Amino acid sequence: SSAASDVYKRQMLLYVVMAIFCSLGLITENRLWPMVAASLAPTGCLMAFLALWTGSLWGRPTWGAYWVWDARLTSALILFFFYLGYIALQNANPDWRRADKACAVIGIVGVINVPIVYFSVQWWNTLHQGASITASGSSIHPVMLWALALMVIGFWLYTFAVTFVRLRSVILERERNQEWAQQLALKGEL
């Protein structure tokens, strides 16, 4: 379905953006970039989970099974595992700098899987349909297209809001011993 396709695309885009910030963190050694990547990972992981879960619920009546080892499903599951690995590694190491470097490797290596997820329906004979919305038009009824557009806007607003709230939390957690953070805490501005 188009809604599930949008969730697939969102998880892939979030992973690519996360990998970019991982790369920037390694190249520039700026502390902010890994914090942004760490803030994106849980939302991307949630989107990956939602795509797999709702896809399996849709797949049961459509394919007769909750799970089939389809190229799109399998590559999306691998991307979900990359998200889980990133989050687990980030939380397993109390030294933020070391965790950021190790997570950057996962972020950069995992981005190789993104084109596989995206192009799997074109490269292999899969159970998934091709794109419903293309440059040449849409195969979706206009009423459903509007509903899809509203859902996409809502999900993106949610994604931005949650990511920025999480980024604020990560910054304050990592910088809690810095003078500026302590002064803001004393003023009650946190």
Specify the residue positions occupied by each region the protein language model found.
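Short, small-residue-biased leader/transition segments that mark boundaries at the very start
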Residues: 1-8
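Membrane-interface helix-loop-helix modules in multi-pass inner-membrane proteins
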Residues: 43-88
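A glycine-rich, hydrophobic loop/mini-helix early in the fold
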Residues: 9-59
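Hydrophobic cores of alpha-helical transmembrane segments in multi-pass inner/ER membrane proteins
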Residues: 9-21, 78-90, 146-164
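Membrane-interface transmembrane-helix boundary segments in multi-pass integral membrane proteins
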Residues: 5, 123-157, 179-190
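Hydrophobic alpha-helical membrane-insertion segments
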Residues: 103-119
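Membrane-interfacial loop-to-helix junctions in multi-pass inner-membrane proteins
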Residues: 29-46, 66-69, 94-108
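Membrane-interface capping segments at transmembrane-helix boundaries
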Residues: 161-175
